């Protein structure tokens, strides 16, 4: 396993533990006398002004629209690296996690729609249980230490990267508002400029980031979700320059600790603080939270394992060396931890809907993700080889 992947796994695992802590603190604050302080913090107004351009948003929207664009920039950098030089570069190595990821997105969406097909607003949340929180999943896996085979970690990483790619496509196609033409045309022009810079192998990442900020503003104003700007920039920063150095990896190395230790925990803190005031048992047993929780807890493992098993039996894909189907199933349960990514999609799906949709969707995500984390850990613990005791 390369040094880059090792560093990625260490950061994601420890960052996942920080995510859990941030979410617990948010839940406590939202349901105690500290709730007023919590809501005031999220509502802090922040304004950025450049000449005639003025962006005035509360803190929570800066987190969701701006900081998460940086997260998706890192995702873009990671996906490009893995597609060109990493675990997805060779077809025979990429096809197994790719097929698993497709099943892991399809089955949860179908389970969710089974429960919510009669609710026109609820149907919009079909993609909520399709996402996997790689940081959280690796954080749980890290609790088992050296017992986890490297190949199993790489499988989870590759699956999650393809899953992220699917989420990006879903956001672009299904969760964008009505489009404003002029900002969209400007965004297209800047994207062409970035493409030309990439083609000429311009290695100065500052140029890409400045144009990326302008692209983010244009996409924000166009009505398409602004996080897509991060993905575009991530894909268009060169993986190798003319001398063979990697501007992409250098930027990823700089940004990744900020994403793992600040941006994602701050996102979790800002969005996981669900007030249980007014929450009823009937509401918790309604189709929205049940569809999300079962989509994550049952849909993810059913889809990932079924598609994996069928692909191996039909000879379409090959099971990676040093791991078995029992371990694949245990990891597929861990992939039901949707958490930050599911919360992010829920915010897009139910933007403008009554607050109950946001509240119960987040509760469904928290319940489903918690069940997936606990059961996934127990299953992994039972199927992984025990460490040999040193003889005295």
From Swiss-Prot:
Protein name (database record): Na(+)/H(+) antiporter NhaA
Bilayer topology: Multi-pass membrane protein
Location(s) in or outside the cell: Cell inner membrane
Regions that span the bilayer: 17-37, 59-79, 95-115, 125-145, 154-174, 179-199, 213-233, 254-274, 290-310, 328-348, 363-383
Biological processes annotated in GO: regulation of pH
Molecular function, one GO term: sodium:proton antiporter activity
Keywords from the named record: Antiport, Cell inner membrane, Cell membrane, Ion transport, Membrane, Sodium, Sodium transport, Transmembrane, Transmembrane helix, Transport
Family: Belongs to the NhaA Na(+)/H(+) (TC 2.A.33) antiporter family.
Pfam families in UniProt: Na_H_antiport_1
Any GO CC annotation of this UniProt entry: plasma membrane
The keyword Ion transport appears for this protein: yes
Alphabetized Gene3D superfamilies for the sequence: Na+/H+ antiporter like domain
Record flagged with keyword Hydrolase: no
Catalytic activity reported: Na(+)(in) + 2 H(+)(out) = Na(+)(out) + 2 H(+)(in)
Predominant location: membrane
Function: Na(+)/H(+) antiporter that extrudes sodium in exchange for external protons.
